[in-house]
From Swiss-Prot:
Name the record gives this protein: Cytochrome P450 130
Taxonomic classification: Bacteria, Bacillati, Actinomycetota, Actinomycetes, Mycobacteriales
Originating organism: Mycobacterium tuberculosis (strain ATCC 25618 / H37Rv)
Superkingdom, natural source: Bacteria
The keyword Transmembrane belongs to this UniProt entry's keyword annotation: no
Assembly information from the UniProt record: Homodimer.
Binding site for heme: 101, 243, 295, 318, 348, 352, 354
Amino acid sequence: MTSVMSHEFQLATAETWPNPWPMYRALRDHDPVHHVVPPQRPEYDYYVLSRHADVWSAARDHQTFSSAQGLTVNYGELEMIGLHDTPPMVMQDPPVHTEFRKLVSRGFTPRQVETVEPTVRKFVVERLEKLRANGGGDIVTELFKPLPSMVVAHYLGVPEEDWTQFDGWTQAIVAANAVDGATTGALDAVGSMMAYFTGLIERRRTEPADDAISHLVAAGVGADGDTAGTLSILAFTFTMVTGGNDTVTGMLGGSMPLLHRRPDQRRLLLDDPEGIPDAVEELLRLTSPVQGLARTTTRDVTIGDTTIPAGRRVLLLYGSANRDERQYGPDAAELDVTRCPRNILTFSHGAHHCLGAAAARMQCRVALTELLARCPDFEVAESRIVWSGGSYVRRPLSVPFRVTS
C-alpha cells in the first residue's frame, strides 16, 4: 500500500527537521500557495509559498512582500523580542535598508574574506586533526559550531575571549520564535547582547580596527549624541550574531549525512578537488539552512488562483524552493556535486540577499576541502544526529562522526 503525504503545512520542530521534504513536495505539487489557519487563533492565519518561481518573485518584490514587520509567522514579532523601536537591517525595507546596507558593506569586502581565510583554514585543520587523533567525535561541537562564531566575531571585531557568549544569545532568541516561545529568555539575551556591543562601539571610537563596527563608527554613525545611529549599529550586531552563526553550522552539519549516503559523490570530489566550489553550491541548495522566512503583504496580491490579502504573513519556503523539480529537474532531491545549480535561494534574493554569503561560502569550501583531504573515509551515525529546535533554521546540534582510516 502506498502512503500519501498530506499537504498540510506544519512549522518544523527538532523531531520533524530530519525529513521535511515529503511535506514540501506535497505542497509544491498540490497547494503551492497554502493557507494556514490556526484553529485556536484564526486571526493569526498566514500563507506558505513552496515553489521556486513564486518564492524567487516574492523575495525580490520588497514593495509587496515587506520585511519591516518581522521574519517569522508570528504577528507582533518585533515586540516579542524587544526590537520594535530598533529593528535590525534584515527587518527593514528600502530605502532605509539600502542606505545602511551600503555603510555596512564596507566591512564585507572580498579583501575581508581573503584576510580571514588563513585563520579559518588553520582553525579547521586543528579541529580536524584533533578529531582524527581521537578516531572521531561530535563534529558539530568540535568544528561546525565554533567556526562561524569565530568568523562573525572577526567581522565585528570581538575579542576571542568573548566568542562563547554568542551561542547563548542565539539559542535564547531562536527559542522565542517557537510556537510557544520563551520570550523572557529572548529579552534577557537581547539586553545582554546590546549592553556588550554598546561597550564595544564606544571602544571602537578610540581604538578603531578593520571590522564592520569600526567602519560604521568611522562613517559617523552614532556620533555626537546620535542615539538612533548607535541603535542602528546595535541592531546590525543582532543580525550578525543571530543570523551569521547557524547558517554555516546548518550547511556543514547537514552536508555530513548527504556525503555519508553517497560515497560515489564523495569519490568524485576526492578524485577532483577542483570541483569542491561547485559542490558547495549543491550542498547549499540541498541543506538550505534557513528553510524559510516570512514577509508581510503591503497590498492584496494574487499568486496562481489564490489572492493573499494585505497585511498577512507569507512564509517564503526557501528549503522547498531549492528542491523544486520545476527548477532543478526530476532528480532535484538528489545530491549531484556536478550540478552547478543556478538561482539557489539559500541566501535569499533581492534587496535582502545575505551580506555574508561570500564569507559563508568560503568557510564551507575550506571546511569541505580539508575534511575530504584529512578524513576521506569518514562515517556518520545518522540515527544519532540531534537537530535543533526552532522552526526556521535547520541545523544539527550534534553529528556523531567517525574516522575509519
